[in-house]
């Protein structure tokens, strides 16, 4: 899904049409410390649950398309009082030299709690 014409956020009005039975993830990108509208993203993902075809036990447990955010340019930001890294199902942070937080290379992945997954998973 491309960006909107008046800002750098994804065009949420086109997201629903982009989800097909083959879609496994939506990957929003938080830019310049500004998180995406996760309420809109999750609303669309939930509305398309009937199309989702799981290919693994973890996808079955999630039961819908995963929301995997790129939060590298929003480290420390919040969405409605929740730190980025705890909003999407999974959030990735690159620590490349051009990112807001750098270790020259590397990165991390965070995830929010999901009652269908135990700590061992």
Where are these regions (language model features)?
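Short beta->alpha connector loops at strand-helix junctions that form conserved
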Residues: 1-4
């Amino acid at each position: 899904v491309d960006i909107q014409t008046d800002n750098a956020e994804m065009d949420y009005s086109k997201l629903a049409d982009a989800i097909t039975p083959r879609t496994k993830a939506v990957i929003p990108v938080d830019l310049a410390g500004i998180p995406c509208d996760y309420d809109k993203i999750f609303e669309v993902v939930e509305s398309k649950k009937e199309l989702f075809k799981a290919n693994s036990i973890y996808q079955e447990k999630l039961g819908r398309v995963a929301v995997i955010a790129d939060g590298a340019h929003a480290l420390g930001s919040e969405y409605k009082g929740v730190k980025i890294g705890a909003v999407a199902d999974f959030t990735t942070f690159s620590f490349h030299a051009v990112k807001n937080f750098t270790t020259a290379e590397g990165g991390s992945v965070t995830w929010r709690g999901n009652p269908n997954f135990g700590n061992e998973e």
